[in-house]
Amino acid sequence: SLFSLIKAGAKFLGKNLLKQGAQYAACKVSKEC
């Protein structure tokens, strides 16, 4: 259904944002931006 598709997309986006956030934080901590 459309709802489950939207939920799957949101979960995928959330994971991507978490990964990007972690990379950004690591970059800031190590000052290698």
From Swiss-Prot:
4Fe-4S as UniProt keyword: no
Record's function text: Shows antibacterial activity against both Gram-negative and Gram-positive bacteria.
Annotated S-S bridges: C27-C33
GO biological-process terms attached to the record: defense response to bacterium
Taxonomy of the source species: Eukaryota, Metazoa, Chordata, Craniata, Vertebrata
The UniProt record lists the keyword Secreted: yes
Gene Ontology CC terms, in alphabetical order: extracellular region
Key words of the record: Amphibian defense peptide, Antibiotic, Antimicrobial, Disulfide bond, Secreted
Homology family: Belongs to the frog skin active peptide (FSAP) family. Brevinin subfamily.
Organism of origin: Glandirana rugosa (Japanese wrinkled frog)
Name recorded for this polypeptide: Rugosin-B
Pfam families per record: Antimicrobial_2 (PF08023)
Expression by tissue: Expressed by the skin glands.
